[in-house]
Design a protein with these regions (language model features):
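Active-site acidic short loop of glycosyltransferases
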Residues: 6, 132-133, 159, 176
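Feature captures the FAD/FMN-dependent oxidoreductase FAD-binding
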Residues: 76-143
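A short beta-to-alpha transition loop/helix N-cap that caps and shapes the active-site region
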Residues: 41-46, 145
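Extreme N-terminal leader/targeting segments of oxidoreductases
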Residues: 1-8, 26-31, 55, 88, ...
Length: 200
């Protein structure tokens, strides 16, 4: 069977994907679908669960501004909220505006081709499902893939190593462990004191 023609297809259900879904579906009245690789909404804030993860911008800047009641009703508990609170906020947005009904979770896009003959995008998922859309919005963000550095000898390392962009959702027990850290960006600064509190 030929794939159904959508008005728009959005890749990613983080801040940008949720907002675009609301804008295109609810305001523009378009037939829209979001494809999300994770099993939940949140984008960066779904994937990045490393110890100490939090925003480094004030909480008010994380409020979607398209609805006065949404802005009024949500109360951040901290000036710089932690990852779990930001993820709760995004789930709140998805529920409040019934966005989940137009989101397919656990669906990774493997290919997108623009076909001039039909003036549309043909999008294929990792399982071979296909979707066709007049408009394609890649809302995958700049942090959707871990930037794993090419460190000589990493493949020979006998211990465990973790990247903050691929942190296990069940967490890591560092109690009594010797831990080394590479990197002192905002993620490193957030995670180091939390890990150090448990490590040897």
């Amino acid at each position: 069977p030929a794939p159904k023609m959508l008005d728009a297809l959005i890749i990613g259900a983080g801040f940008a994907g949720l907002y675009q879904l609301h804008l295109l579906r609810d305001r523009q009245k378009l037939d829209v679908l979001v494809l999300e690789a994770a099993d939940g909404v949140g984008g960066t804030w779904y994937w990045n669960r490393y110890p100490g993860a939090r925003c480094d911008s004030e909480s008010w800047s994380y409020c979607l501004q398209f609805d006065d009641a949404l802005v009024r009703d949500w109360r951040w508990t901290e000036r710089y909220p932690r990852q779990p609170e930001i993820l709760r906020y995004l789930n709140h947005v998805a529920d409040r505006f019934d966005l989940r009904s137009h989101i397919r979770l656990n669906t990774r896009v493997s290919e997108a081709q623009f076909e001039e003959a039909s003036d549309s995008w043909l999008v294929t998922t990792a399982t071979g499902e296909q979707y066709r859309a007049r408009f394609l919005i890649a809302a995958v963000g700049c942090l959707s893939a871990a930037n794993i550095p090419n460190i000589p000898g990493l493949g020979d390392f006998k211990g465990r190593w973790y990247h903050t962009g691929e942190w296990p959702h069940e967490g890591v027990d560092f109690t009594g462990k010797r831990v080394g850290q590479v990197g002192t960006g905002s993620t490193g600064i957030q995670s180091a004191p939390v890990i150090a509190a448990d490590a040897a």
